[in-house]
Design a protein with these regions (language model features):
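Metallo-beta-lactamase
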Residues: 5-9, 103-152, 208-211
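Short acidic active-site motifs
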Residues: 88, 294-298
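Conserved beta-strand hairpin/beta-sheet module of binuclear metal-dependent hydrolase folds
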Residues: 4-64, 154-157, 161-165, 267
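Active-site neighborhood of phospho(di)ester-bond hydrolases with catalytic His/Asp-centered motifs
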Residues: 49-51, 73-81, 101-104, 163-167, ...
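FMN-binding flavodoxin-like domain, especially the glycine-rich phosphate-binding loop
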Residues: 175, 186-224, 228-231, 273-288, ...
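Active-site-proximal loop/helix segment associated with metal-binding centers of metalloenzymes
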Residues: 148-152, 168-203, 247-251
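Structural motif
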Residues: 45-47, 75, 137, 161-164, ...
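Active-site metal-binding motif and surrounding structural segment of the metallo-beta-lactamase
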Residues: 44, 55-102
Length: 397
């Protein structure tokens, strides 16, 4: 069954989509599925860029055999050694034992850790600035360490002006029959997933992404071929601008993300009152229950919005546990350039605002508003003035 797609006259997509996997990296929910992309270049010397996840092995090998036909496979270029892209290396080398595996020194260190058989592979070690010529195509290797593993390489092709970008510019989401971004309404179909993918998978490494973007800026890029999601051949500047914002922790919008935690509904009522007040002031606010929303979606909202409002009860003398997990994720990912407004609820000893302030103070270039909200057990009409003042401070931030 035909599972390959032509990108150019001699570059083919030979990947597969997975709609059965429930959690990417066994962490992040992906109800939209995911694609594992691999690319074949049919030149005087044939080349495959990366393999795929073990879950799609049958489809992948069928695709590879289809595009190769009776030809030999000359090179397997490994840009990224994460198992969702490298799991079939030993399978490919078993089918094509004369193939030369291309990577850098770290690539081969990791490869032998995953596959002891890799010690016997034919290898070509490359580094930043090296090239691989296959006939019409010449691939220039660009080091992109920690985007998002230390061994990551990018490859730029002189002939097609394509950037093989490893995990950079990728997204969650299976492909629905088309492989090109311009075959979709990308902002509707993929943008939220793309942002969530970036923020949670790559977000910690903004400085390293910036370094890679600076290298890419000197290239005439006409296509971007990532290891997840659709291929870009139009409007590439739009995607690069998104990555510029995301990697510099620059909000995409003035909108407000309000995240609350509530045991019995009383803190929820306070959060709803704050959201209502912000709407009355013309602000766009999105409200999220921290207990009912996977933290990866909340992290995506942090990357999107300028202002983050956090309201939750004190729990066992600490921060409400789901909110604490969210805070820990923000700190681990190095969130920057945001404004935080904090509220708390407690029946006898509310102290969440202080504890959240202490945690958030570890972040760079953030503003924590002095005006806070404290509810004792439940929201009452006597609290309206405090709610209004809290709303005003957020609206003016």
């Amino acid at each position: 069954m035909r599972g390959t797609k032509k990108i150019t006259e001699d570059i083919f997509w030979i990947g597969a989509s997975d709609r059965r996997l429930s959690r990417f990296e066994n962490i992040f929910p992906i109800p939209e599925g995911v694609s594992y992309n691999s690319y074949f270049v049919d030149d005087e010397k044939t080349v495959v860029f990366d393999t795929a996840d073990i879950s799609v092995s049958d489809q992948y090998i069928e695709n590879l055999k289809e595009v190769l036909g009776d030809k030999k496979l000359d090179y397997l270029v490994v840009l990224h050694m994460e198992p969702d892209h490298c799991s079939l290396i030993d399978t490919v080398t078993a089918y094509y034992p004369d193939v030369t595996v291309v990577g850098n020194s770290k690539t081969f260190t990791f490869m032998e850790q995953f596959f002891p058989s890799a010690a016997g592979f034919k290898k070509l070690e490359v580094k930043e600035g090296d090239t691989l010529s296959t006939g019409k195509h010449t691939f220039h290797f660009v080091a992109a360490p920690m985007v998002h593993w230390p061994e990551v390489l990018l490859a730029y092709d002189d002939a097609s002006k394509a950037l093989f970008s490893a995990d950079a510019f990728g997204t969650f989401g299976a492909l629905d029959g088309g492989i090109f971004a311009d075959e979709y309404d990308y902002e509707k179909d993929f943008l939220d997933s793309s942002r969530r993918y970036y923020a949670n998978i790559v977000g910690k490494y903004g400085m390293q992404v910036q370094a890679a973007l600076k290298k890419a800026a000197g290239l005439d890029i006409q296509m971007i071929l990532s290891l997840h999601g659709p291929v870009w051949r139009k409007n590439i500047e739009w995607l690069l601008e998104k990555y510029e914002k995301w990697s510099t922790y620059t909000p995409e919008t003035e909108e407000i993300a309000l995240v609350y935690g509530s045991l019995y509904g009383h803190t929820k009522s306070a959060a709803e009152a704050v959201a209502s007040g912000l709407r009355e002031k013309g602000k766009v606010v999105k409200v999220h229950d921290v207990s009912g929303t996977d933290v990866s979606y909340l992290i995506g909202e942090v990357w999107r919005c300028k202002t983050i409002v956090l309201i939750c009860p004190t729990y066992n003398g600490g921060v409400y546990p789901p909110m604490e997990a969210f805070l820990n994720d923000m700190i681990a990912l190095g969130v920057q350039n945001r404004t935080f407004a904090l509220g708390q609820n407690g029946t006898w000893a509310p102290m969440t605002v202080k504890l959240m302030t202490d945690k958030l103070s570890a972040l760079k270039n953030v503003t924590i508003l002095e005006n806070t909200l404290t509810i004792k057990s439940a929201l009452h009409s006597a609290d309206q003035g405090q709610v209004d003042a809290f709303v005003d401070s957020i609206a003016k931030a």
